[in-house]
Amino acid sequence: MQTLWDVLIIGGGPAGGLAALDCAKHGLRVLLVEQRLFPRWKVCGCCFNNQAQAILNSRGQNNLIVDSGGQALRSLRLGLRERETTLALPNGYALSRERFDQALIHAAIQAGATARFHVTAQVEAASPEYRRVRLKDHQSGATSHAKARVVLVAAGLTQRCLPKHEAGLSDIHQQSRHGAGCVVDDDSHHYPVGAIHMAIGDRGYVGLVRREDGLLNLAGAFDREALSQGKGAIDAAQHVLNQAGFPVPEAVQQGHRWQRTAALSRSTGVVAGERFLVMGDAAGYVEPFTGEGMAWALTAGAAATPFVLKGVERWTEDLETHWKSTLQLTIGRRQMVCRALSSVLKRPRPTALLFELVNRWPAVAEQIISSLNEAKLPSPKGEPCL
């Protein structure tokens, strides 16, 4: 007989992992499926700001980052046109996605969740009591079905888990940049631990941060045209670093392989439907800064539990409406700042003016960073927070 899960979560990133943990701690039967094997690397700045930490603390994971080896971040170093300025960065940490995501899933399993890896999921028909999901195990090749009262879709930027007639259309912003990243072994003194190093160029930007294992993580956002020329991300990154006056790590010069993402800035037409909620990057994304991307994902993961609890008891259209409002109020407002900043960074003259402002009056920039780091927890009752 098929198990009827209270909630089936598609995606083992921060949003899915935290939702699995929180739902399991509330006594729900939780199945999480992830298409890749863990640990796995992701194109990400691997930075956690105060909002991300506050969310983890609120779910009993106060020490998860530190216990996993997280490195404290105290400053943001900016480079533009061979000029530099450094700003204070409040209460940040750097931790590789390999360690963080695995630690979060491990905590969820300890709380009672079931996790399956190298498994893809396709949401199928809904019944009055549950949603049917087709699962494919890519190790054995076997296909099976699962039933869940609620499905959480946290499958990333380009998720295709929902039926076409329910998924809606993703609106990719016309000037959206594309992400690319890599991890390199770099023992130079140019990129010390404890800082986010951000190089800004006319066709993109690159963030560099030293991880807990000493490796250097590079993550950038580039114009599509920049990635289509020469050696793609390798040349695009070197161009940005050279423009900023930042040394190019030797491994990057030697052609170290980069991994690319789809277009970053996008909105999703459908974030909820009959017995499913869309969350994390799958619910819409903007080019993030100073750890905001991780904060958005964790905030969504924490916000989902009260909706799941209500949905397990009885699904209503009000849940779908309130979920959309909750995402807008808890995450959409935070994304507005990053959207405005990314818009400025696409235009050389406003970028230069902003850099001059930051250089002359760093307190103004530090106030903006503080606003991004301001912690706000989602409502424990699943009601929009005004």
What is the predicted function of each stretch?
Residues 2-15:
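Beta1/beta-strand and adjacent pyrophosphate-binding region of the FAD-binding site
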Residues 13-14, 38, 157:
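Residue-level detector of alpha-helix initiation sites
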Residues 24-43:
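Glycine-rich FAD pyrophosphate-binding loop
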Residues 37-57:
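Conserved N-terminal glycine-rich FAD pyrophosphate-binding loop of Rossmann-like flavoproteins
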Residues 52-105:
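A conserved beta-strand/loop capping segment in the N-terminal third of enzymes
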Residues 94, 226-308:
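FAD/FMN-dependent oxidoreductases across multiple families
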Residues 107-247:
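Predominantly flavin-linked oxidoreductase catalytic cores and closely associated redox partners
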Residues 306-386:
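C-terminal helical "tail/cap" subdomain of flavin- and related membrane-associated enzymes
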